[in-house]
Amino acid sequence: ELGVERRFVPESCPRAVRPGDFVRYHYLGAFPDGTRFDSSYDRGSTFNVFVGKGQLIAGMDQALVGMCVNERRFVKIPPELAYGSEGVPGVIPPNAVLHFDVLLIDLWNSEDEVQVQTYFKPEKCPRTVQVSDFVRYHYNGTFLDGTLFDSSHNRMRTYDTYVGIGWLIPGMDQGLLGMCVGEKRIITIPPFLAYGEDGDGKEIPGQASLVFDVVLLDLHNPKDGIAIENQLVPESCERRSQTGDFLRYHYNGTLLDGTLFDSSYSRNRTYDTYVGKGYVIAGMDEGLLGVCTGERRRIIIPPHLGYGEEGRGKIPGSAVLVFDIHVVDFHNPSDSVSITVHYKPSNCTVLSKKGDYLKYHYNASLLDGTLLDSTHSLGKTYNIVLGSGQVVLGMDMGLQDMCVGERRTVVIPPHLGYGEDGVEGEVPGSAVLVFDIELLELVSGLPEGYMFVWNGEVSPNLFEEIDQNHDGEVLLEEFSEYIQTQVETGKGKLAPGFDFEKIVKNMFTNQDRDGNGKVTAEEFKLKDQEAKEEHDEL
């Protein structure tokens, strides 16, 4: 009788040998006394054969039926189910009982197809692999008995290929179709859809079934353009970015499987660039057009519009890029100051002009609403002489032609604000500034170029009046005391908003033409006299 002893049966046995199946197995052949007559191990290759088709001795044909991959059986075959009364000359004597220690390695049928078992699938799957798509995936490749023959993980790089155009073995071409990014599946491929009778000449023997444990990381098609997903669009969007605009934005950059490769947030500063001029990758150039300040959008960029086949830094070659961006502000180099008046008193006859002394309150913010500064929090006004360079040029422009009590919003582009450098720790570089302003007080200034004017007629003996000790020389102390008296008595007026001592010293220095610290009658001239002399010379 045929004797079959199951010495090891794996816990999992999804499939057992049936007549007509093709098997690969190892064996030791011995006589009952233990004398070995054959071994597949000695030859270094499995025995490969169809079961139930008369290609084996009858006893082995029967003994293999019902076996699982990785199962081990001890088989006793009587001579009438083996080589009978004739035996095999020189190897097996007549009427010999044969013992076989069998280990099943592989099993398939010519009717088999590719088997796909998905064991993880993301909840969101906006796109699946189609013919002609380009994919990047990791895999572990094993035989049916679990022996590893290859792994992309060991090489620490994905396998990158087109699907469905013959770049892969036919079974893998089929097995990858319909996958989502992030999906994990086991693809079992019979040899006639893999490397066939000859194997690959290296690690994979002939007639081997292959098992690939695959995780899909990336997917695109060469015909893809960028994809934009609007995540947040402000209700108010007065202006959208155009080619030539300069943008400041934050971003998180990830691969399609969610792997982070870069983030402006980690550097605590925005990414600042022109749009549509080739300063950024082509896909980002396109994806940043038409955005509003404050908008959040996701831009998905295929590799031919990103970093191509070579990649860069942490970005692998042929990688789809996902940028989650937040637009902080944008402007155009041709922009000027923008003024929006919210309130203007009905009696608005005196308008601010260059040289006027202004007191005003303001709230300063970035274009996205981030508060930078506020005079209200300081409890005092901000005081300047308009047009004197005490504020940025854009503010000088924005405060022109205001009346007391007026409220307005002034938007200042960076080239009229703090420029590319900004103010360290306070104002970012290339930032658009928004000032909400209320003018509280206006003191009219003097004509341009004047630091002091008379409110009445000028004394014809002006030098003698200043020279109190009549020594023919005026010192700074005498000059300062005289000017102060004129201001206090209302006979003269100093330019408002400046330090008294600095103005007086400046006036004195202008008169002290030889720089000896004294002004003589010959040096002393009024401004209108100086202008007349210059005219006469001309």
Range-by-range predicted roles:
Residues 1-538:
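Cross-family detector of peptidyl-prolyl cis-trans isomerase
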